[in-house]
Amino acid sequence: MSLDKTQIISQILNHSPSHIIIGYSGGVDSSVLLDITKDLDIPTIAIYINHNIHPDALKWQLHCQTICNNANIDFIAHSLDQAPKGESFEAWASKQRMDFFIEIMSQYSSPILLLGHHLDDQAETFLIQAIRGSGLAGLASMPYYKQLNHGAVLRPLLDYTKKDIQDYASQNKINHIYDDSNENIKYRRNLIRNQIMPILEQINPNISRTLSRSAKICAESSNILQKLLNEKLQKISQNNSLIISELLSLDKDIQKSLIHHWFKETTNQSLKNKQTEEIHKALNNDIHTGWQFDINQQFQISVEYNQLIIKNNNQVDLILDNKDIIEWLKERFNKDFDTRELIVRQRQASDKCRYQGRDKANKLKVLFQELKIPTSERSKAKVILLNDKIIAVYPFFICD
């Protein structure tokens, strides 16, 4: 179908963004997005991520900068380092890109990030997740719209095919670059795009739309499941721990889903299926206090009486030896406290704090973004607790 510029603009404006951020590679997809939004009366920032892999990467960066200068669009270029040894470059680079986008978004009141993923990308993502053996959440692939702690992500081209986008670019004489590394089948997505999808199209000429529809069904089912699990989790959890007797009173499949969901909600990390199975099996074998299971270098799950608890291996128990932290706290905290009762630890994904002068608590990640604390500085944060309540986040702020 033909790309509907008016409809896409309407979908963007429905979210009333203060600023538009575009992930701009110079390729046809993001170039079409830039063309569609360039005349909107909304401040727009195009971000080019230089992966430092292709020999033409700097030339593409200059191309993007020239296009933006000519259209009076703000332009930011960000360069990535090499991926850590042993890590998948695709996964690492994807996280690095999103982290940088979020850092820029945190500077504005209600920004929206536009990404140029299209229907064929969605079909490829579905296959990648299926090959990995992903569950519903993974098979849901890429969401059309996602609310972030600060701003939102929108993929306005997700219902359009690559051909629809190329036709629009041709009709509107849009200048864009072509990345020949997209032909390199050493990358899984390129292998699927260039070799597997053509074979599947022989079976079903509309395979991209079919797989994209399957991803949408999985997304809807996953959303329903998450809501049901959240409701159940509230009933069988206490202070981020699971009440074992309550958990074991449920259907076994629900038990496993809740263990996986509880860990993800608490740590912002996912258990592997094998880990979930092992924890579930141990719980049903009448384990007792003292049982421990290492998830990774950071987290450990243990049993204490009737509770399943997540321990952070990076956690520091006592604050007594942290003189700098004590002095910092004494200067800012307006209540008396016994240093022997204080605990300092690394922050966790579920941590919340009621910032001074506010009526309700927010997740620390939200506060970091609102206070414009750079991503590079957030790793320094230490959570200070008194009587199991967060009273401060060193060296940034005090909580009410």
UniProtKB/Swiss-Prot annotation:
It is found in: Cytoplasm. Its EC number is 6.3.4.19. It is an enzyme of class 6 (ligase). CDD domains: TilS_N (cd01992). This is tRNA(Ile)-lysidine synthase. The keyword Transcription does not apply. Belongs to the tRNA(Ile)-lysidine synthase family. Keywords: ATP-binding, Cytoplasm, Ligase, Nucleotide-binding, tRNA processing. GO terms for cellular component: cytoplasm. InterPro entries: Lysidine-tRNA-synth_C (IPR012796), Rossmann-like_a/b/a_fold (IPR014729), TilS/TtcA_N (IPR011063), tRNA_Ile_lys_synt (IPR012094), tRNA_Ile_lys_synt_N (IPR012795), tRNA_Ile_lys_synt_subst-bd (IPR015262). HAMAP family: tRNA_Ile_lys_synt. Disulfide bonds: none annotated. ATP binds at S25, G26, G27, V28, D29, S30. The N-terminal region contains the highly conserved SGGXDS motif, predicted to be a P-loop motif involved in ATP binding. The lineage of its organism: Bacteria, Pseudomonadati, Pseudomonadota, Gammaproteobacteria, Thiotrichales. Pfam families: ATP_bind_3 (PF01171), TilS (PF09179), TilS_C (PF11734). GO terms for molecular function: ATP binding; tRNA(Ile)-lysidine synthase activity. The keyword tRNA processing applies. Ligates lysine onto the cytidine present at position 34 of the AUA codon-specific tRNA(Ile) that contains the anticodon CAU, in an ATP-dependent manner. Cytidine is converted to lysidine, thus changing the amino acid specificity of the tRNA from methionine to isoleucine. GO terms for biological process: tRNA modification. Its main location: cytoplasm. It catalyses: cytidine(34) in tRNA(Ile2) + L-lysine + ATP = lysidine(34) in tRNA(Ile2) + AMP + diphosphate + H(+).
